[in-house]
């Protein structure tokens, strides 16, 4: 896999259409310029459609990974169910009830964690496990669903992999997939670019 080690961060994004009244908005808009709110600058880009994710990757000479590329990057060469191995612990990934410091159960689900957060370090007393894939990629399970590039004949839907902060741990297995229309966007959906 030759691609981004992490999900795309908000600070790296280019913004064309953003519903400014959306409560999940993590951007500021001032004098015609969008910027990530300081507390979200190192979090994954969310609220992006398949078309937006694809356009962003192509603008920089990359592409959305195919489902096979994504799965190979997450799994490596064996049949492990999770990018880091055989089992999951609460401090492996961001998912419902993982109890990470960013969880906000007063709203639906939990919030995203910073890109690469589950790297084996301690943050404010919270010990993470190194949850990188065999290829050293982070956030391949949990945090946000990631769009893939596959377009299947006679299907309008596009597919996402990896699970998110609003699913349970059983949906973080590498073979799990989700789908939506290509215009769908959500606080639980982001993307990763590949070369």
Predicted features, each with a name:
Residues 187-195:
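Short, structured beta-strand segments at or near domain termini in extracellular proteins/domains
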Residues 1-3, 60-61:
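Short capping motifs at secondary-structure boundaries
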Residues 11, 16, 20-178, 182-187:
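Functional-site microenvironments in short loops/helix caps that host divalent-cation chemistry
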């Amino acid at each position: 896999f030759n691609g981004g080690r992490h999900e795309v961060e908000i600070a790296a994004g280019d913004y064309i259409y953003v519903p400014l009244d959306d409560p999940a908005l993590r951007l500021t808009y001032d004098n015609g310029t969008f910027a990530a709110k300081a507390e979200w600058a190192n979090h994954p880009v969310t609220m992006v459609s398949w078309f937006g994710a694809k356009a962003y990757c192509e603008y920089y000479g990359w592409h959305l990974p195919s489902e096979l590329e994504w799965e190979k990057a997450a799994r490596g060469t064996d049949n492990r169910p999770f990018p880091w191995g055989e089992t999951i612990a609460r401090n492996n990934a961001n998912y419902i009830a993982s109890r990470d410091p960013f969880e906000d159960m007063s709203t639906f689900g939990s919030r995203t964690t910073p890109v690469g957060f589950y790297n084996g370090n301690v943050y404010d007393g919270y010990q993470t496990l190194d949850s990188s894939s065999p290829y050293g990629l982070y956030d391949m399970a949990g945090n946000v669903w990631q769009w893939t590039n596959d377009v299947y004949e006679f299907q309008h839907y596009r597919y996402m992999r990896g699970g998110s902060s609003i699913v349970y741990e059983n949906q973080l297995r590498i073979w799990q997939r989700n789908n939506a229309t290509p215009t769908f966007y959500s606080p639980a959906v982001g993307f990763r670019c590949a070369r």
